[in-house]
């Protein structure tokens, strides 16, 4: 029942990122990276020592044979080297410039394999005839060739031509829970896998078949733990493996079958050897893409996959074309870089806004001009003309007015912007100034008295009352038709010095 529910809850992946969960739980990544670097350093030192020994031997050989060579032969060799090197350099640069791409088909296929084929309903319904187990028990031959397992293991070993050109035996030697090119081969079932692991005879023959295919690839099994190494004929077999790329599909099948039949620990050493030969030693350069795209992702343990990918990333050339790395860390580094570049500009923008907003707060309203008295008598008429042009109806809103019985109006300024007026019975308006900024001087001097509202507010109320009584201005109505002169001003005190009132505002018609 559990398998049925897993099939119902399974969601088909739609992207490569959905299929690849290698870097999702990268716990202990730093420790793994340190271990990988230590292994790489040790391997690098060993390779350098071997290279140094080879160089010393070559130098000795060239020194011994250099006396026999003539000058013309050396010139010809140098010319040939100059001719061939540019072509090799161009081809290598062209190959390096091609950036690889992830295959969604490969990622989805290996995702299903690592998750034990969640949509494989056939595994639940198919009859358990155990064809693969009976073949390994040497009870039935494989179809369609009709050859038993013992004949394959004994007579086909070392026959590289037969192993290369026959395409029907590999599905029987390394069965999977998926259909292959040989439609006569039966798919594995979960029940058959359990029975296969329990049968020692079948497991023994399975290991022998694995050794036979390793020999075909130029590799040999070193121990029972699955460690592998180069075979004596590795140079010839690696060259053949580099040219016959259809064998990469066989390697992928072998790796999958190892995991199905209980030999998951055999896969990392074999994959690492292929990465070593294809990326580092460059003996099988055509295998590079398949090793990174297929072989690595047959391993079910994420930690093992990360180790192998770090090893490959360390040696991959050019490094910017390595697309199997941790995407989360790359994005985090990019985000950090973008944050460092964006924060100064944003701070500048905020400071610029603050600089612009500060002057707006410091703007003050213009102060109302005070009444000024000209010392020269000839300028009195000019001052009165300016007063007439600038007088407005705000006198009513700024000053307090009193309407008397005789029609005159007396206005009193109360040092506030919204003054009040009192209308008299006679129709005149009396305005009383209480917000003047006048500073009293000596009684003998003829200087002007300024009407400053701020200075007047600081005075006590008693002083303001006396000042207002001395500076009463009576506005009289003169002519109805006159628009230029709104009113005539007459001093309210007996003093010979005339106090003039200048009101700032918009122009209005005469009082009625």
Swiss-Prot record:
Residues 1-72, 323-469, 488-512 are annotated as: Disordered. Belongs to the opioid growth factor receptor family. It comes from Xenopus tropicalis (Western clawed frog). InterPro entries: OGF_rcpt, OGFr. Residues 347-361 have a biased composition (Basic residues). GO terms for molecular function: opioid growth factor receptor activity. Residues 408-421, 490-499 have a biased composition (Polar residues). It comes from the Eukaryota. Pfam families: OGFr_N. This is Opioid growth factor receptor-like protein 1. Residues 28-54, 62-71 have a biased composition (Acidic residues).
């Amino acid at each position: 029942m559990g398998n049925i529910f897993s099939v119902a809850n399974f969601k088909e992946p739609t992207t490569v990122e959905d299929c690849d969960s290698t870097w999702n739980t990268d716990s202990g990544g730093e420790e793994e990276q340190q271990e990988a670097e230590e292994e790489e350093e040790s391997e690098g030192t060993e390779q350098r020592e071997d290279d140094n020994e080879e160089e010393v031997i070559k130098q000795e050989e060239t020194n011994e044979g250099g006396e026999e060579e003539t000058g013309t032969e050396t010139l010809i060799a140098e010319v040939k080297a100059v001719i061939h090197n540019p072509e090799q350099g161009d081809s290598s640069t062209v190959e390096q410039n091609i950036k690889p791409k992830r295959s969604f088909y490969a990622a989805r296929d290996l995702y299903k394999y690592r998750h034990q084929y969640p949509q494989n309903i056939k595994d639940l319904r198919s009859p358990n005839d155990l064809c693969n187990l009976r073949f390994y028990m040497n009870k039935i031959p494989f179809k369609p060739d009709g050859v038993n397992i013992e004949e394959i293991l004994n007579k086909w070993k070392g026959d590289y031509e037969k192993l290369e050109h026959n395409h029907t035996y590999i599905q029987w030697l390394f069965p999977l829970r998926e259909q292959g090119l040989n439609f006569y081969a039966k798919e594995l079932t979960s029940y058959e896998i359990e029975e296969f692991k329990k049968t020692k005879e079948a497991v023994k023959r399975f290991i022998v078949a694995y050794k036979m295919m390793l020999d075909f690839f130029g590799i040999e099994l070193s121990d029972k733990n699955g460690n592998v190494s180069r075979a004596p004929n590795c140079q010839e077999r690696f060259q053949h493996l580099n040219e016959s790329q259809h064998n990469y599909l066989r390697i992928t099948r072998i790796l999958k079958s190892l995991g199905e039949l209980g030999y998951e620990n055999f896969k990392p050493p074999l994959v690492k050897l292929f990465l070593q030969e294809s990326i580092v030693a460059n003996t099988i350069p055509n295998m590079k893409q398949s090793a990174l795209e297929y072989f690595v992702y047959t391993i079910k343990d994420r930690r093992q996959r990360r180790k192998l990918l770090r090893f490959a990333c360390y040696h991959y050339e050019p490094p910017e074309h390595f697309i199997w790395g941790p995407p989360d860390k790359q994005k985090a580094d990019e985000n950090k870089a973008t944050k460092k570049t964006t924060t100064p500009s944003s701070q500048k923008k905020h400071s610029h806004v603050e600089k612009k907003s500060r002057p707006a707060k410091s703007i003050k309203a213009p102060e109302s001009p005070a009444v000024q008295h000209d010392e020269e008598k000839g300028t009195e008429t000019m001052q009165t003309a300016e007063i007439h042009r600038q007088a407005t109806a705000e006198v009513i809103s700024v000053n307090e007015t009193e309407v008397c019985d005789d029609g005159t109006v007396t206005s009193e300024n109360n040092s506030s912007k919204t003054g009040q007026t009192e209308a008299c019975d006679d129709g005149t308006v009396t305005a009383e100034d209480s917000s003047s900024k006048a500073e009293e001087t000596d009684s003998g001097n003829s200087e002007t008295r300024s009407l400053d509202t701020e200075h007047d507010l600081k005075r006590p109320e008693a002083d303001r009352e006396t000042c207002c009584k001395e500076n009463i201005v009576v506005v009289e109505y003169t002519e109805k038709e006159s628009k230029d002169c709104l009113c005539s001003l007459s001093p309210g005190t007996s003093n010979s010095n005339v106090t003039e009132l200048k009101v700032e505002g918009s122009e209005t018609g005469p009082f009625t």
